[in-house]
Amino acid sequence: KLREIRELLPKYIKVYSPSALKLKSPIENGKTFEDNSIIKSKYFSKKIKLPCLADDSGLEIDILGKAPGIYSARWGGKSSDFNKAIKRVYKELNKKDKNWRNKKVKARIVCALSICYLDKIIASVKGKVEGNISPQPKGKNGFGYDPIFIPIGKKSTFGEISPNTKYKIDHRFKAFKKIKKFL
């Protein structure tokens, strides 16, 4: 994710991960991607006394009531293992409908970005890509749920699409287009 963010930001902006600054992440107890993005942005801004941009993103599957949603990483357990998370998605889909692989399962990948300076919210935006869940994981590119997400208008998963092509159509790119004017 950090590499993708670096690619999308202007080169004059320095990017640091929380671990590079030896900071633990805050508890993400918001109810939406936007809430969690703001929680992280405010938290890190207060820690380093600089404006901070934070991302919160995940997968929403309609038939699962928009789950995993804000819990997307947590579906992979404590280590956020997305192979586990993908297996859980398939398990949950099988519980809902044994025949789901023969249908189009509507889903979207969402990215919320926020910029905060201390307690002040400078900007908060959202980007999303609509699509469907692939009956089986495909591709080695990207990360997270990329191997099981097929964007509308494509026949391939994000995991099969080249990074350069994906960056031009994905949820994070759409969110960055909206937030660029605040950078």
Where do the language-model regions lie?
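Anionic-ligand binding patches
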Residues: 1-183
